[in-house]
Amino acid sequence: MYKLVLIRHGESTWNKENRFTGWVDVDLTEQGRNEAYQAGELLREAGYTFDIAYTSVLKRAIRTLWHVQDRMDLMYLPVVHSWRLNERHYGALSGLNKAETAAKFGDDQVLVWRRSYDTPPPALEPTDERAPFNDPRYAKVPREQLPLTECLKDTVARVLPLWNESIAPAVRSGKQVLIAAHGNSLRALIKYLDGISDSDIVGLNIPNGVPLVYELDEDLKPLKHYYLGDQDAIAKAQAAVAKQGKAG
């Protein structure tokens, strides 16, 4: 049996402001830093250790990983930073308040943009300052692979090459792997691992800063998964994530 630990970054400044974030590189709030540190404490107390970690190239995930490593005394851990673990690109919605957007377009439309499998939000114009083309962190990524908007289907297609080529081989080799990423890049991976249908994925909500443990068989098929921590608090956090895209 193998174990894989996933963690969504702690609360970011735009999580707090209920804004669509996507590839915009916002930082953690004080609460987010505390959530990350507490995640490290939960993992340490439960006896976990790691051989390698994976994260995105966005600071809210990177800093979350730092705090987990710090609390676990694993600052030396090899870390792979990949744009493939970035949050889903929210296109022209990037930076907009979710509730205000729902009030304008309707709860149902915003739910489709946020949680459906194959309907992307309106795309950015290539000349928009939020477009990734001139960002140095993506200088080595072929321009045609850089998105101006994404649906979850696009995010799955982006994440899976990293899983197949790097993460899965690391797990199979016996390494203890930690992934610190984002709500939708983790939803994409979980959809693949658990075989969740396109329609059912809409109901999957991942709370900030809570370790999610997957126990996998020799074929990397899930045997079970569970969150570490107070289960009532986790359920409330998941419900709060689900409400973010509603008008009020």
UniProtKB/Swiss-Prot annotation:
Catalytic activity: (2R)-2-phosphoglycerate = (2R)-3-phosphoglycerate
Annotated protein name in UniProt: 2,3-bisphosphoglycerate-dependent phosphoglycerate mutase
Subunit: Homodimer.
Keywords: Gluconeogenesis, Glycolysis, Isomerase
Positions marked as site (Transition state stabilizer): H182
InterPro entries associated with the record: His_Pase_superF_clade-1, His_PPase_superfam, PG/BPGM_mutase_AS, Phosphogly_mut1
Organism of derivation: Burkholderia ambifaria (strain MC40-6)
GO biological process entries: gluconeogenesis; glycolytic process
GO molecular function: phosphoglycerate mutase activity
Keyword 4Fe-4S included in the entry's annotation: no
Biochemical pathway: Carbohydrate degradation; glycolysis; pyruvate from D-glyceraldehyde 3-phosphate: step 3/5
Function per UniProt: Catalyzes the interconversion of 2-phosphoglycerate and 3-phosphoglycerate.
Catalytic residues (UniProt): H9, E87
Binding site for substrate: 8-15, 21-22, 60, 87-90, 98, 114-115, 183-184
Enzyme Commission code: 5.4.2.11
First and last residue of the signal peptide: none
Classification via PANTHER family: PHOSPHOGLYCERATE MUTASE
Keyword Kinase tagged: no
NCBIfam families tied to this protein: pgm_1, PRK14115.1
Highest rank taxon of the organism: Bacteria
Matching CDD domains: HP_PGM_like
Family statement drawn from the similarity comment of this UniProt entry: Belongs to the phosphoglycerate mutase family. BPG-dependent PGAM subfamily.
